[in-house]
Amino acid sequence: MSTRGASLEGAGRGGNPPPETTAVRLHVEQASYAYHVTERGAPQFALGPVSFKASRHEIVSILGPNASGKSTLLKLLAGVLKPISGFVRIDSFEASELEPRARAQKVALVQQESALLFPLRVWEFVLQGRYPYGKRLRFESEEDLLMAGNALAQVGATDLRERWMDKLSGGEKQRVILARALAQQPSLLLLDEPTQHLDIGGKLELLRRLRRLADENRYTVIVVTHELNLASEFSDRILLLHRGKALAYGPPQEVYKRELLEPVFDAPLDVELAPSGRPRVMLRDANGAPWSSRNSN
């Protein structure tokens, strides 16, 4: 196993990051959450104290098996849940204390796909991202239409504008959902398993777009994913969770270590350097020989 490599500060950006990258956008300090308490009054923690910071232009991937606390943490970052200890701050504002419209102008949460309640065309769906800026239920001001159009252009979906949402392919729909989030003009993008149901080509296209959005528009992007190797290739930092605890946070080459990953994912693993210089995780069979990495791509 080899985990050697250069530091990934600013990795994925083709060199040193711009000076403003050092500006902290998201600050999480000793944040924890419990969904309920036992009969004796003891809290049952879904997430223990977690601390990390993320800056402009950065992509941070949150990794961990099922029930590790990933979705709970994402809701804390979005301000949907309030931590029972510590804090979550976006641009120095407490996320859970922001009025809903103000919060929606700072953070956009892209959750796993849900069914539409009624038919919508793509432009109507993306226009919903402008709701935090309006005073009426329906928004069709010139500014709103312009921002919705810009959001579609950012994800390469301008040609989909008049299509019905239920007629889109998985990859097309994922781009449009991302466009609706961008129409909010947030500084922080939160995505829950955005590559789910996409083929490998669709996954790579989506992650390249996220990388470009972070680089060119100063977004901070937080991605919950189970795709270890894709996360390694596109992320600046990795947060590894297990059973509600944060085990490691740092560049992929600091986190992708066999002794850390094997107990978390309960599988025999090898870690090697890919041609890109990023860590690559491979399963080992019963004889210790590496399997194809198709199951961890």
Please tell me what each predicted stretch does.
Residues W164-L168, E172:
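Conserved ABC ATPase signature
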Residues V264-N297:
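ABC ATPase nucleotide-binding domains
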Residues Q185:
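Conserved catalytic motifs of ABC-family nucleotide-binding domains
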Residues A78:
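Helix-to-loop junction immediately C-terminal to a conserved catalytic motif
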Residues G86-E94, R103:
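Conserved ABC transporter NBD signature motif
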Residues L189-E193:
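Catalytic Walker B motif of ABC-type/P-loop ATPase nucleotide-binding domains
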Residues L63-P65:
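The feature captures the beta-strand-to-loop junction immediately N-terminal to the Walker
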